[in-house]
Amino acid sequence: MLHYINEKATAEEFITIGIYSGWPSYVYVLNELYKATKQEKFKRGALTALSRMTAQATNIGKGIGWIEPVPFSDITGITGEREVIDLSVGAAGAGIIYLYAHRQGLSDDALPLAIKTADRLLEVAQQTPDGLRWLMMTDMPFPFTAPNFAHGGAGVGYFLADLYRETNNEAYLQAAVSAAEYVKTRVHEQSKGFLVCHTEEQQPASTFYLGVCHGPAGTGRFMHLLHKITEDDRWQRWLIDNFEGLVSTGAPEERSKGLWNNYGQCCGDAGIGDYALYLYDETKDERYLAFANRIAKHLVSAEHSSASADQSISWAQAEHRSRPDFTERQTGYMQGAAGIGSFLLHLHSVIQGAPCKLAMPDSPFSYG
């Protein structure tokens, strides 16, 4: 990995600024490797990735932004370039990594760059009667108004709220609260609790994602962070009712439109299970631990054991809901066995009374 990063950086080749798949992810992984091993080469690699992330930014308006190839062109067929602004593939995710780099003492420039990123995001926010919202790109080439964590206002709001903790700039907190108020207007009642629609284009809404990307396990992170910052219990009550909406679908045994044959951290069971464990830690409510155990049992029932001598296990899953028949045995963290294994280890540590999970930059939860 380090060789790959150095090679790409030397050639000044493009790598996306997606927090889970591009330069920001390398900043995080390499710095964590440095912390674990004290080998300076990993710290240098993290700084290299951070430098390349910044080099790909453009001065736009009141801050900085990133112009990249249109995301998901392999699915939509739409090509070209756009300014990407969301958490998963855009500026908000890059901003979160700048905050991480600042807190880790990697760069004196990291916080000023996070501020420039946020100032551009404030500039491109869409004003609505219900509050502020952000889309995946500033100029969407296809209809996709997603209010949740990965590609919508919940993710951008999370970054702005987190930045407020470092700057005490009320403009960031006010924008984050406005984003949360907007999300609250996109809920749909379930038999118990409520869920937020996947996209606003679907009318009436019938698809409700449950995972981190567009479901309670992601948007709940935003609400929990607001609760931590403001100490306003309405945000915690909201995420609890939102989780009740998730449970009311019959998950994980019942697979709804928003919980298809995907078991990973991003869209599926592993991310939901981790979220349940964090809620258990916060509330001591045994229902969350019981739900995490149900998730684990379902994952075990869905795994495929190799007949080879290594006795490996894997999960055949569809990364994209729109292509359920295109399954792969993925190995990554957000999509694949690494993320599923991480949840199972997390659950084991909780059951043993010594909860352990490496804190991620896009999560307000930690045991440290």
Predicted segments, located by residue:
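Glycan-recognition and catalytic cores of secretory/periplasmic carbohydrate-active enzymes
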Residues: 1-368
